[in-house]
Amino acid sequence: MTTPTSVRERAVPAPAGRRPERGARWRRVGLRLVALVVLLALWQLVIVLQLWSPVLVPSPAAVWRALLETSGTHDGVRGYQGHTLIEHLGISLRRIFIGAGAGVVAGLVVGVLMGTLPWVRVVLEPAVAFLRTLPPLAYFSLLIIWFGIDEAPKLWLLAIAAMPPVAVATASAVASAPTALVEAARAIGAGRGQVVTSVVLPSALPEILIGVRFAFGIAYSSVVAAETVNGLPGIGGLIRDAQRYNQSDTVILGLFAIGISGLLIDAGLRVLSDRLAPWRRHA
């Protein structure tokens, strides 16, 4: 006679279910590695065939040498302009996390208010839409006039650039919260604040995190452009300074540093999204 325990044991397909997932993950990794190798091969082929001047398109080896030179001390010179590549990148990331972090918090507050209070949406939606359509560098000059050329205008730029996408995503997600869940929470005596924190925000979390990912992407592109003004140390300042002296290998190295760190930040936000909202996987 079959016992309930044996039926349950045979009904557990977890190990078999995980194998296809792992296989698909490794296939994606393999395809990306192949694509990377192909791109490097094409890059080297351009150099071998001398399709462009090495001054304009440096070889992978030249970029590698630039990495070594900017990562340590060579001929008595430390890194680039006294700072190593990782220090330049770290300073830019610090600006992003402080400035964009403030913008994300502001966007969450504005978005929740817009999504829960119709009159707030009527008042604030045009202003948020106006800021959203402005290129961040369009008001950077005004921020320099107001705050000078040090850190303050850069941080304000990042905060203002990061706020609109989070506010729009949050407002839309909060307004679309399941009515049945909201009414059920109110029926058991939950106040407005409890409904927002216990029902509305958890249901809106996936869309909010998508807005946060967009905000950090906008902030990254904005800080690199902002660092062209008194941006040393900083990865944008490094690129701008190297461009002045036609150091294309250092410029490309800086671009790689930006791209790789940006991918890592986005991957981290995606993992955080999957952890906080496992019921909704992002493509």
Where are these regions (language model features)?
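Transmembrane alpha-helical segments of polytopic membrane transport and secretion proteins
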Residues: 1-37, 267-283
